[in-house]
Amino acid sequence: MVEDILAPGLRVVFCGINPGLSSAGTGFPFAHPANRFWKVIYQAGFTDRQLKPQEAQHLLDYRCGVTKLVDRPTVQANEVSKQELHAGGRKLIEKIEDYQPQALAILGKQAYEQGFSQRGAQWGKQTLTIGSTQIWVLPNPSGLSRVSLEKLVEAYRELDQALVVRGR
């Protein structure tokens, strides 16, 4: 089981779709060697060094957290049903209301659209909020994603810089 890493007062909570088998096996988020999450958040400015999956709890030192829409591990995210994503979206709203981070970053357009019953999402900041928490949709850093490392870092850096501008 991959546990959430959450606390009150975070700058951002990154929300993956669901754990892959590597993460489920180790208990650490974004654990597959091909997953670029740790490299991307470092290069985008969220951390001052590249953390390893087993150091995930140190995200809290940087006022960052991690959660997921669906707890069930799969080989690929497309094995998760629309119903699971929708139910996960409802649970996620409750978590975000409890912890009230400055931003929630959903990693993937389809995850956002299905989890929050939205259509036509664009990358970046969304008009929908959860209380005062901004919602951002960022490309998924999975090794299966065709988005380049450069584009991932650019998208995540936009969120980091927006939070800096807000004084967070």
Swiss-Prot record:
Excises ethenocytosine and uracil, which can arise by alkylation or deamination of cytosine, respectively, from the corresponding mispairs with guanine in ds-DNA. It is capable of hydrolyzing the carbon-nitrogen bond between the sugar-phosphate backbone of the DNA and the mispaired base. The complementary strand guanine functions in substrate recognition. Required for DNA damage lesion repair in stationary-phase cells. Keywords: Cytoplasm, DNA damage, DNA excision, DNA repair, DNA-binding, Hydrolase. Binds DNA as a monomer. HAMAP family: MUG (MF_01956). Subject to strong product inhibition. N-glycosyl hydrolysis proceeds 100-fold faster than product release. It holds the Pfam family UDG. GO terms for biological process: base-excision repair, AP site formation. This is G/U mismatch-specific DNA glycosylase. It catalyses: Specifically hydrolyzes mismatched double-stranded DNA and polynucleotides, releasing free uracil. The keyword Cytoplasm applies. Its EC number is 3.2.2.28.
